[in-house]
Swiss-Prot record:
SUPFAM superfamilies attached to this UniProt entry: Release factor (SSF75620)
Keyword Protein biosynthesis (UniProt): yes
Name assigned to this protein: Peptide chain release factor 2
Residues recorded with modification N5-methylglutamine: 251
Primary location: cytoplasm
Source taxon at top rank: Bacteria
Species per Swiss-Prot/TrEMBL record: Campylobacter concisus (strain 13826)
Family annotation (InterPro entries): PCRF (IPR005139), Pep_chain_release_fac_I (IPR000352), Pep_chain_release_fac_I_sf (IPR045853), PrfB (IPR004374)
Length: 366
């Protein structure tokens, strides 16, 4: 890096920070924090626990955003000031030190961008994720299992907790269906980028002739619906089936028909849960899954109506990413346009940067 490149980087980062500032509105956040602090002084503040909890959650969220913005803004300002001073004094040591730190400064602004992109109403919620293999039998079942493992490894890396709600093993390998809930900060904000069709191209380990196969799996992601969100579901619109828990449902597999499958007739949405020995608990969880799916469906309808996203980007049937393992190795995301050669690392859960690339690309198009 030379002085011209560094100066251009500072200009780019300064513009980014200013653009983020126009969205974040730090002065408005400071004013809102003062409002909340005044409300907290009320002796009756904790009488309404739900309201107090919501305000505390809001306070933490906007305080964190303000701190990140202030830190990034100050970092760019300090770097600019120090660079100008070092140039005026021909201080090569300081200039080289700034060059070496350029990557860290750039990453700080990217992290601020991501924080801003994950500040949506539902981004902070837990995520309910379902993976369904496409046509292709064992090959597709195995691909669904590979995706499931990729997400589990990603959750381990990021400190998300995972609870499997339903797991149905494939007949020869892989899985026929899996649903799980991801719990943690911005779980839905990250996982919403995985909503869509995932395509795999590889030499099949199940083909004795070693031919190339293409497999598909769909990933569906919904925000876990809070109890305070009302979604009306009429009993007449539901078809409820019970069945025996099977496969890798875990230690709770038993001989009673405790597993629940609920079909929402008007939309055709199907949810399943076999996580618990209790049919009653499985039904409650399945209903929560259904509410989350219906909530997500309504959000997508609103987005489509407002034209905030292209129609092709909305549905769960949209192909979002290709994973090519043969004849070359590359993962390409159709939304960001980015291609990655570290296929092994990605399938081992190293997908954070790829997801963040999608979030940034989608914001740029909005």
């Amino acid at each position: 890096m030379d002085s011209y490149e560094y100066n251009e980087l500072l200009k780019k980062l300064q513009t980014k920070v200013e653009n983020i500032g126009s969205i974040v509105k730090p002065d408005d956040i400071k004013a809102r924090l003062k409002e909340i602090e005044a409300i907290e002084q009320d002796p009756d503040f904790w009488q309404d626990i739900a309201r107090a909890g919501a305000l505390n959650k809001e306070k933490t969220k906007i305080s964190n955003m303000l701190a990140k913005f202030s830190d990034a803004n100050q970092a760019v300002s300090d770097a600019k000031e120090l660079f100008e001073l070092a140039n005026s004094e021909n201080d090569e040591e300081t200039i080289n030190s700034l060059f070496e730190d350029a990557k860290n400064l750039d990453e700080k602004i990217v992290n601020l961008e991501i924080s801003m992109l994950l500040s949506g109403e539902d981004d902070g919620k837990n995520a309910i994720v379902s993976i369904h293999p496409g046509a292709g039998g064992t090959e597709s079942n195995d691909w669904a299992s590979m995706l499931y493992r990729m997400y589990l490894r990603f959750c381990e890396r990021e400190g998300f907790k995972v609870e499997t709600l339903d797991f149905q093993e494939g007949e020869e390998a892989g899985l026929k269906d899996v649903s799980f809930i991801v719990k943690g900060e911005n779980a839905y904000g990250y996982f919403k980028a995985e909503n869509g069709i995932h395509r795999l191209v590889r030499t099949s380990p199940f083909d004795s002739a070693g031919r190339r196969h293409t497999s598909f799996s769909s990933v569906m992601v919904s925000p876990e619906v809070d109890d305070d969100i009302e979604i009306e579901i009429e009993e007449k619109d539901l078809k409820i089936d019970t069945y025996r828990a099977s496969g890798a449902g875990g230690q709770h597999v038993n001989k009673t028909e405790s597993a629940i499958r609920i079909t929402h007739i008007p939309t055709g949405i199907v949810v399943q849960c076999q996580n618990d020995r209790s049919q009653h608990k499985n039904r409650a969880t399945a209903m929560k899954m259904l509410k989350s799916r219906l909530y997500e469906l309504e959000l997508m309808k609103q987005q489509e109506a407002s034209n905030s996203v292209e129609k092709s980007e909305i549905g769960w049937g949209h192909q979002i990413r290709s994973y090519v393992l043969f004849p070359y190795q590359q993962v390409k995301d159709n939304r960001s346009g980015e291609a990655y050669s570290q296929t092994d690392a990605i399938l081992d859960g190293d997908i954070k940067k790829m997801i963040e690339g999608v979030l940034i690309a989608q914001k740029a198009e909005a």
